């Protein structure tokens, strides 16, 4: 069922580049400035690869939908102690304070969103990350919004 996780060890840096490439490089008409801030070496994690792909898919597509025309979309991976911190930042309008906590619920959709959709994407992200007891969140930053999570690294 939905609760089965099948962890495997893999390089998260290469994995992110592959997933992001599939989602972002193939959009020649895309009007944004894609930036990466990634380690120059492999960083291994032990997690369910297909679930993590769903997480990245949803977070990256969400950022792509909300980035201002010509704005920055930035993917970052930072190592700290035994953790790898992922974030995706998009320049764009802030999320109203009262909506920040609601954004992870099943049918939340920003009424200002230009896109129709089920609103399930972020709920799926929350479910998968919670199942693995990973810390995740969203915050307004100067000029935009960042979604983030942290995952333990393995040797």
Stretches found by the model and what they are:
Residues 6-9, 28, 33-43:
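Conserved catalytic submotifs in the C-terminal HATPase_c
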Residues 95-107:
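Short conserved segment of the HATPase_c
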Residues 1-5, 44-47:
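Conserved micro-motifs of the catalytic ATP-binding
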Residues 6-24:
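A conserved beta-strand-to-alpha-helix junction within the catalytic ATP-binding
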Residues 57-58, 62:
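Conserved polar catalytic motif of the HATPase_c/GHKL fold
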Residues 121, 125:
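Short alpha-helical Gxxx[C/S/T] motif in the catalytic ATP-binding
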Residues 133-139:
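Glycine-rich ATP-binding loops of the HATPase_c
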């Amino acid at each position: 069922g939905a609760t089965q996780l099948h962890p495997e060890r893999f390089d998260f840096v290469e994995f992110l580049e592959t997933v992001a490439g599939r989602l972002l490089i193939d959009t020649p008409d895309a009007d944004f400035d894609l930036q990466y801030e990634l380690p120059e070496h492999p960083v291994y994690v032990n997690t369910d690869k297909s679930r993590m792909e769903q997480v990245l898919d949803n977070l990256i597509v969400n950022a792509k939908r909300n980035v201002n025309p010509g704005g920055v979309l930035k993917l970052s991976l930072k190592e700290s102690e035994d953790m790898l911190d992922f974030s995706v930042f998009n320049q764009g309008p802030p999320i109203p304070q009262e909506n920040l906590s609601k954004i992870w619920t099943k049918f939340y959709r920003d009424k200002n969103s230009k896109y129709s959709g089920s609103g399930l994407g972020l709920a799926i992200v929350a479910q998968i990350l919670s199942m693995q007891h990973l810390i995740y969140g969203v915050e307004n930053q100067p000029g935009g919004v960042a979604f983030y999570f942290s995952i333990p690294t393995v040797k």
